[in-house]
Amino acid sequence: MWGSRIAVALRILVVLAILPVFLLLVYSLPFVRPVSTLMVKDYALLQGVNRQWVDIENIAPVLVNSVMMAEDGQFCSHGGVDWHQLGLVLDDAGDGGPSRGASTITMQMVKNLFLWNGRSYLRKGLEFPLALIADAVLSRKRIMEIYLNIAEWGPGIYGIEAAARHYFKRSAAKLTARQAALLAVTLPNPALRNPAKPTRNMQRIARIVAGRAMRSGPYVTCVK
């Protein structure tokens, strides 16, 4: 009996391991429009979901640049995991210093596609191999496109097109540099940050991000 249960459990584990790889291959097709686990949950609970897919060509470049500079400035140069940044995080943790994030845009994308929210060493451990696989399967441009279309920008607001229309009454293609920067700095905490009504601290960070986005040319070539 125990032998058969173990065999079934192993089969389930194999399927769970293979499924994300298969889905990433499917998501490499440009006409496929993935959804996040949060969106699936909202659909299952019959909660409202505001998401309008938009191709990356129809997103203002300043928004793409702002998100990259705010979330993952080395997006075009690492392989899905920023090992240098991760090393700095581990050093800080060992020294008892303040915590900092090491999640890349690729890691955030796979988390949104396949995993759950909340702090968890297990989830973080799963992000690493999934991000490496995603980087091998998908182009950087496709990774950015998927991320911008599944990221949460507020309760029930998914994707940059829905966010741009909800907060600024315009399409993602027509966002200004200031609006793009405010949307970018909203991403780490969309439940508490409102880009249409930014706090002074949000405005300060947005100005920094906007400045970096203006000088981001050498860092954003992979999404052009």
UniProtKB/Swiss-Prot annotation:
One Gene Ontology MF term: pentosyltransferase activity
Give the GO cellular component terms, alphabetically.
Answer: peptidoglycan-based cell wall; plasma membrane
- Which InterPro entries did the record assign? Glyco_trans_51, Lysozyme-like_dom_sf, PBP_transglycosylase, Pep_trsgly
Keywords for the protein's UniProt record, in alphabetical order = Cell inner membrane, Cell membrane, Cell shape, Cell wall biogenesis/degradation, Glycosyltransferase, Membrane, Peptidoglycan synthesis, Transferase, Transmembrane, Transmembrane helix
At the top level, the lineage of the source is Bacteria
The places in or outside the cell where this protein is found are: Cell inner membrane
* Pfam families with a match to the protein in the record: Transgly
Chain ranges passing through the membrane: 12-32
Q: What class of enzyme is it?
A: transferase
User: Reaction catalysed by this chain?
Assistant: [GlcNAc-(1->4)-Mur2Ac(oyl-L-Ala-gamma-D-Glu-L-Lys-D-Ala-D-Ala)](n)-di-trans,octa-cis-undecaprenyl diphosphate + beta-D-GlcNAc-(1->4)-Mur2Ac(oyl-L-Ala-gamma-D-Glu-L-Lys-D-Ala-D-Ala)-di-trans,octa-cis-undecaprenyl diphosphate = [GlcNAc-(1->4)-Mur2Ac(oyl-L-Ala-gamma-D-Glu-L-Lys-D-Ala-D-Ala)](n+1)-di-trans,octa-cis-undecaprenyl diphosphate + di-trans,octa-cis-undecaprenyl diphosphate + H(+)
EC number assigned by the record: 2.4.99.28
Q: How does it sit in the membrane?
A: Single-pass membrane protein
Q: Name one GO biological process term.
A: peptidoglycan biosynthetic process
Which NCBIfam families does its entry note? mono_pep_trsgly
Its job: Peptidoglycan polymerase that catalyzes glycan chain elongation from lipid-linked precursors.
Q: What is this protein called?
A: Biosynthetic peptidoglycan transglycosylase
